[in-house]
């Protein structure tokens, strides 16, 4: 009887040990460590997804512990570069600006950053206009400004990445938010939560935002007042992709599908930027390899955390980053044949 219990106990012990071994994705020589992931605001999408993915990584590789802390798209590359974090969410074009020291976002380059995957999710620039303004394209909006018409617009807040990008777009056309003001128009910089009431109550006739699809605030505005998203030309989308690192037109992602919002039955071409995951170049190659592997082999899990991650394509993830790939990530992509 005692021998039977010994055999049973040994069997349980063996299964337990086997389970631990199977749980390890990384090589036996990989050292255990705790890493800090700077995400977005607490309770927001970035923060929530980072927390969920951190738990998945730890389940599959117990030697990797990830602590998630609040952050933001503009500040994350700085914190990463200065050694205050090991992993960070990033906005593709913002990361490129940080790496190159592009003003007005950054006053110097932050080179101590790397990436493991690009285009995890996409946010869309919504150039919304009231239908009574009689236009359907951004080119027509620009023409109004150049004619000196008094435009009333709700714009993103200074300091946000979307304020910078919409400013770059206007600059491409030779106009600016200041030009709108000089014409006697109104530029109200507002948080997104305030834009619907400004639009509905006719304090503004236009609203510029950058959000995922479908955007609740745009839905609210388009229901409260007949509206249209202004279509952007191939030229401006290609220019921003080449110059700043926004999503390329050839990706097929630069459109808001018809039916997303009330009164807009057709696809509307627009500018969009992508999300990527950054890491410190100092992170061990084997740790980054494991994180990249878990990320690329668990897309369904990401989509459960957020529907916006449906656009994530592991086969292209290593090719759409805006800063250099970490060697550990590159090793994974080469191993599976995604990068030759």
Task: Give the predicted meaning of each segment.
Residues 1-33:
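Short, low-complexity disordered leader/linker segments with a strong preference
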Residues 93, 98-123, 128-138:
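Signal peptide-directed extracytoplasmic domains
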Residues 120-124, 148, 271-272:
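Short, solvent-exposed loop/turn segments at the edges of secondary structure
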Residues 92-94, 103, 115, 133, ...:
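Pocket-lining segment of extracytoplasmic ligand-binding domains
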Residues 141-146, 246-302:
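Bilobed periplasmic-binding protein/Venus flytrap-like ligand-binding cleft at the lobe interface
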Residues 32-60, 64-67, 125, 129-201, ...:
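Bilobed "Venus flytrap"/periplasmic-binding protein-like clamshell domains
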Residues 49-56, 67-108, 193-198, 213-222:
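Pocket-flanking alpha-helical
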Residues 206, 211-223, 229, 272, ...:
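An extracytoplasmic/periplasmic, membrane-proximal ligand-sensing/linker region
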């Amino acid at each position: 009887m005692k021998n039977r219990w010994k055999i049973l106990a040994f069997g349980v012990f063996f299964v337990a040990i086997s389970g631990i071994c199977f749980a390890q994705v990384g090589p036996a020589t990989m050292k255990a460590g705790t890493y800090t992931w700077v995400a977005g605001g607490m309770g927001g999408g970035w923060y929530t997804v980072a927390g969920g993915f951190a738990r998945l990584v730890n389940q599959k590789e117990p030697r990797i512990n990830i602590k998630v802390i609040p952050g933001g798209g503009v500040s994350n590359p700085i914190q990463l570069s200065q050694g205050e974090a090991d992993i960070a969410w990033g906005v593709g074009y913002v990361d490129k600006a940080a790496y190159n020291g592009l003003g007005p976002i950054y006053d110097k380059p932050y080179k101590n950053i790397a990436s493991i995957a690009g285009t995890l999710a996409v946010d869309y620039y919504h150039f919304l206009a009231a239908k009574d303004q009689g236009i359907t394209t951004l080119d027509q909006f620009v023409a109004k400004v150049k004619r000196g018409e008094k435009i009333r617009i709700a714009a993103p807040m200074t300091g946000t990445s979307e304020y910078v990008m919409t400013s770059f777009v206007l600059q491409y056309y030779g106009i600016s938010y200041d030009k709108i003001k000089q014409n006697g128009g109104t530029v109200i910089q507002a948080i997104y939560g305030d834009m619907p009431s400004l639009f509905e109550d006719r304090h503004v006739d236009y609203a510029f935002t950058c959000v995922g699809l479908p955007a609740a605030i745009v839905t609210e505005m388009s229901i409260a007042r007949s509206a249209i998203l202004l279509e952007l030309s191939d030229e401006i989308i290609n220019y921003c992709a080449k110059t700043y690192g926004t999503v390329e037109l050839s990706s097929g992602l630069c459109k808001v599908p018809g039916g997303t919002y009330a009164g807009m039955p057709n696809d509307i071409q627009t500018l969009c930027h992508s999300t990527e995951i950054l890491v410190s170049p100092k992170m061990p190659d084997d740790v980054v390899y494991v994180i990249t592997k878990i990320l690329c082999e668990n897309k369904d899990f990401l989509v459960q955390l957020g529907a916006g991650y449906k656009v994530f394509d592991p086969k292209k993830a290593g090719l759409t980053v805006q800063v250099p790939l970490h060697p550990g990530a590159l090793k994974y992509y080469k191993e599976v044949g995604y990068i030759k």
